[in-house]
Amino acid sequence: MATRIRLRRMGAKKSPFYRLVVADSRYPRDGRFIEELGYYNPSTTPATVKIDEEKALKWLASGAKPSDTARSLLQKQGIMARFAEIRK
């Protein structure tokens, strides 16, 4: 199973927020997922990001590949840097 860390769109029309989830790469964007890692709300000023670092590191260590946007959010939270330290 090829797992991906990606954003799942939620919220009302024209006012989205996103949940950061781990899902099989074959599932649809807003479909079934394995585990929720956090959320991202771009509508607030500044944008709200909350990610469970321990869960994210566990999934990265087990081989989950983040999407481009998810990778950007993980880098801003410092999780990708911590993952790189752990891997060395």
From Swiss-Prot:
SUPFAM superfamilies for the chain: Ribosomal protein S16
InterPro entries in the cross-refs: Ribosomal_bS16 (IPR000307), Ribosomal_bS16_dom_sf (IPR023803)
Keywords, alphabetical: Ribonucleoprotein, Ribosomal protein
Protein name listed in UniProt: Small ribosomal subunit protein bS16
Top-level taxon of origin: Bacteria
Name of the encoding gene: rpsP
Record-stated family: Belongs to the bacterial ribosomal protein bS16 family.
MF annotations from Gene Ontology: structural constituent of ribosome
Species whose genome carries this gene: Syntrophomonas wolfei subsp. wolfei (strain DSM 2245B / Goettingen)
GO cellular component, one term: cytoplasm
A Pfam entry, by short name: Ribosomal_S16
